[in-house]
């Protein structure tokens, strides 16, 4: 970092991720307050209500297919008993800025579930009088990380970095 000089701002740490990386970004921001903003693209839905079966594999994707959260496997068939969900992860990030890019035709995450999570988290942002700090962008598209999506995310992060 010595060569980067003034380009490195340790008080402006932001994270961004696509798909599982988007989920990891949310967890990171929720539990590390040094992270000032997070952007997630196609990164989450509801764990409690993601029991849609064959199309998404439900919570099995976390516990068996890509075992990022293996203990969720204990809740297969009892998803409503999962002790937390992504609206609560988003609420832990509040009032810091969060950008959620969730295409409406995502084959892995049901847009309606993402929308519910964001709306629930919005209530916490409202308590902080920071309702504009959580943004849901929902293009009529599929789960992918196109150059256009990358530009949307990067422009949002740049806007957060230069705001004050």
Show where each model-derived region lies.
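Gly/Ser-rich "nucleophile elbow"/oxyanion-hole loop immediately N-terminal to the catalytic nucleophile
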Residues: 1-19, 35
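Short, conserved active-site loop motifs that form the nucleotide-linked donor/cofactor pocket
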Residues: 13, 98, 133-134
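Alpha/beta-hydrolase-fold catalytic nucleophile elbow
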Residues: 16, 41-42, 101, 139
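Glycine-rich nucleophile elbow surrounding the catalytic serine of serine-hydrolase chemistry
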Residues: 17-27
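Conserved hydrolase catalytic core segment
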Residues: 30-36
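Mobile cap/lid helix-loop segments that gate and shape the active-site cleft of serine hydrolases
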Residues: 40-89, 110, 114-118, 126-131
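Conserved strand-to-loop "acid loop" that flanks and positions the catalytic carboxylate
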Residues: 94-112
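C-terminal catalytic histidine-bearing segment of alpha/beta-hydrolase fold enzymes
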Residues: 118-164
């Amino acid at each position: 970092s010595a060569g980067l000089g003034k380009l490195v701002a340790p008080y402006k740490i932001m994270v961004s991720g696509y798909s599982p990386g988007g989920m990891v970004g949310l967890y990171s921001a929720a539990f590390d307050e040094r992270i000032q903003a997070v952007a997630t693209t196609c990164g989450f839905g509801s764990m409690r209500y993601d029991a849609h079966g064959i199309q998404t594999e439900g919570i099995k994707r976390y516990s068996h297919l890509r075992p990022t959260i293996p203990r969720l496997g204990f809740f297969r068939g009892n998803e409503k008993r999962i002790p937390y969900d992504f609206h609560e992860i988003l609420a832990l990030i509040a009032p810091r800025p969060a950008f959620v890019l969730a295409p409406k035709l995502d084959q892995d995450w049901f847009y309606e579930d993402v929308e519910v999570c964001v709306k629930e988290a919005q209530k916490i942002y409202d308590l902080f009088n920071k309702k504009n700090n959580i943004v849901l962008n929902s293009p009529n598209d599929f789960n992918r990380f196109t150059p256009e999506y990358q530009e949307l995310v990067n422009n949002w992060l740049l806007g957060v970095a230069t705001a004050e």
